[in-house]
Amino acid sequence: RDVWAKVLKSRSEVGMPYIFFTDNANKGAPQVYKDKGRKIHGSNVCSEIMLSSSEDESFVCCLSSMNLLNYDRWKDTNAVELLAYFLDAVLTEFISKASEIPFMERAVRFAENQRAIGIGATGWHSLLQSKMIPFESLEAQMLNCEIFETMSNQSLEASKKAAKELGEPEMLKGYGLRWTTRHAIAPNTSSAFILGQGSQSIEPFKSNYYVKDLAKFKYTFKNPYLEKVLEEKGFNTDETWDSILLKNGSVQHLSFLSQHEKDVFRTFTEIGAKETVIQAAQRQKYIDQGQSLNLMIPPDTTTKDINSLIIYAHASGIKSLYYQHSVNAAQAFYRKLNECSSCEG
């Protein structure tokens, strides 16, 4: 109990440590792991990787993401299959190059034996806002399930097809599959920006208006879906945007917006943390690895309530929790020191 109290205190102060639910990770592990008694002992720094490691094998991450903003364009195509094949090719190149590098034997052996890949997703909140669907809504939950069920079904068929064409790896002999795992949701911070300033991963926008400070330049972000609504209403003015900036990116003070529009453009701090957990639990059944799941907790939330939320996440089958965000300068500084550039990209 004392250790758990320290964990809760630290997460409230600096957003860490991350939480890894070993039991959920192994309950939701691929069937081949269960059949062969392979255990998942840990994750990566961004907490979305759920792969078995041993004295002989060290897991490697092979990840990429589908842009959910364009879901309607690719849902009935072979885009997921192509991405899976692309990641398989990345594994082949890794095996070829790393085989010649000293002390990489365990990583190469894992890649050869398991060929685990992780197709993720980015732009979830952008998709919802483009359709004027509030994050906290039954419609969002239904679309959430549809998307990840579609991706899972398509990647499973791709794995079967690839096994016939390219062969089964050692661990999957007799299973008719090419990849031990197919899905993992990474943070995708940089990728989301590169793809058109969309929302990152499965996370809500933190603000509708802000200045993004990049390595070589600063970029002013205005939510394009909000800008479209403001333009239609005749309020796409500097005065309106200045007021949004003063409200930390919120639009809840704008009287000319309807309640539905205000709900659509709620920011991460204005969306209940439990809703992000509910949606994560819904999609987890279609994800064989894990999700890099951040929680936004208001600074005045009691430790009892935070504890209850984490217990709820565990009971819902969530495998891990990444950062616990809050309006806290110390957290922002500490997170910057500990980001994983590979996953964040």
What are these regions (language model features)?
Residues D2, H41-V45, S58-C61, K75-Y85, ...:
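Conserved active-site and cofactor/substrate-binding residues in soluble primary-metabolism enzymes
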Residues R11-A111, A121-L127, K131, G198-Y225, ...:
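Function-dense linear segments that define catalytic or interfacial modules
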Residues W4-V7, S12-M16, D56-E57, C62, ...:
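Short, well-ordered loop/turn elements at secondary-structure boundaries
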Residues R1-R38, G120-P169, G290:
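Conserved, charged catalytic cores of large soluble enzymes
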Residues N44-S52, I95-S99, H183-G345:
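Catalytic alpha/beta core of large soluble enzyme barrels
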Residues K9, E13-F20, D72, A89-E100, ...:
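Intrinsically disordered or highly flexible coil/loop and linker segments, enriched in small
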Residues A116-P134, D305-I318:
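Hydrophobic/aromatic-rich, well-ordered segments within soluble, folded domains that form packed cores
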Residues L82-V108, E112, A116, K131-N188, ...:
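Internal maturation/activation junctions in enzymes
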